[in-house]
Design a protein with these regions (language model features):
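Ligand-binding clefts of soluble mixed alpha/beta catalytic domains
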Residues: 1-212
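A short, hydrophobic C-terminal helix/tail in secreted or cell-surface proteins
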Residues: 213-219
Length: 219
């Protein structure tokens, strides 16, 4: 599942598990070799879910780099997508390790909710200034809401919708985003967040179930 990247990084000496939506793959010369839509696939969800569960089992903090607008629309993926998405959501919701989400691009609908959003337990959610957070893309939303409008009217309505429903400022006002950070300052804020969460202690019935599952797997 090359559309979902997982791995370990170091932030000020701390080991952090990173999960990211991948849109472009570059070769050794720095040229684009492969491109993906920023959507969730069944294989990508399973890959991320297993990685998050692994990190949680060993109390490794998790960082999510989110840029997702929906789901992969193909027969093969759709057969398994619901189960895989539930697995991913459960992994994030049940994980008691520190969880930080950075929105780097688009974050739309239930696909975003599953990618370590506030709704399923992210400790901190940061976003870049040009990020988009909402139920759906403004252009698609206005085509549904104003089906009979002209192209010029749709363009105007899309701007209004984007300002009211899709901007990162609106998401911050509603509590979905904790802080809007400049890309150049991102590392500093991530380090601060994980240092603050270093002694995090969380207990829920869900986390206890996951803990017992981890113990079973490890033994």
């Amino acid at each position: 599942a090359r559309d979902m990247v997982t791995g370990f990084i170091k932030l000020n000496g701390m080991t952090v598990g990173a999960v990211a939506n991948c849109t472009t793959v570059y070769d050794e010369e720095g040229k684009e070799s492969e491109k993906f839509d920023n959507v969730l696939s069944a294989k990508g969800c399973e890959k991320a879910a297993e990685f998050v569960s692994f990190c949680d089992a060993f109390e490794i903090p998790v960082l999510t780099l989110t840029n997702v607008k929906g789901y992969k629309a193909c027969k093969c993926s759709e057969k398994r997508l619901a189960k895989a998405l539930a697995h991913l959501t459960s992994a994030f919701a049940g994980a008691t390790c520190p969880k930080v989400n950075l929105i780097t691009g688009e974050a739309y609908g239930t696909a975003y909710v599953a990618m370590n959003s506030k709704s399923i337990g992210a400790d901190f959610v940061y976003a870049w200034p040009d990020a988009k957070v909402g139920m759906m893309d403004a252009d698609l939303a206005v085509k549904i809401m104003y089906a009979d409008a002209s192209a010029d009217e749709l363009a105007e309505k899309a701007k209004e919708y984007d300002a009211l429903q899709g901007s990162v400022m609106t998401a911050a006002r509603r509590g979905y985003v904790d802080l809007i950070v400049d890309p150049a300052d991102t590392r500093k804020y991530l380090v601060d967040a994980f240092e603050l969460l270093y002694t995090k202690c969380a207990y829920t019935p869900v986390s206890y179930t996951h803990l017992r599952a981890h113990e079973t797997e490890l033994h």
